[in-house]
UniProtKB/Swiss-Prot annotation:
Organism: Thermus thermophilus (strain ATCC 27634 / DSM 579 / HB8)
Name of the protein in question: Large ribosomal subunit protein bL34
Reported function: Found on the solvent side of the large subunit.
Compositionally biased spans, kind Basic residues: 29-49
Gene Ontology BP term (one): translation
Any Pfam family the entry gives: Ribosomal_L34
Entries under Gene3D superfamilies matching the protein: 1.10.287.3980
Database matches in InterPro entries: Ribosomal_bL34, Ribosomal_bL34_CS
GO molecular function, one term: structural constituent of ribosome
Quaternary structure and interacting proteins, as annotated: Part of the 50S ribosomal subunit.
The entry's keywords: Ribonucleoprotein, Ribosomal protein
Length: 49
């Protein structure tokens, strides 16, 4: 059986990236909550090379 985690930087960015979050009202709420909470990172790091 294929595992659930198949790493892919592009899909990660498209799904969970900052611009993806900003695109929807729900995503903006996520960012707002994470800012209120004082998270260092609002979205997962994708561009690490």
């Amino acid at each position: 059986m294929k595992r659930t985690w198949q790493p892919n930087r592009r899909k990660r960015a498209k799904t969970h990236g900052f611009r993806a979050r900003m695109r929807t009202p729900g995503g903006r709420k996520v960012l707002k909550r994470r800012r209120q909470k004082g998270r260092w990172r609002l979205t997962p790091a994708v561009r690490k090379r």
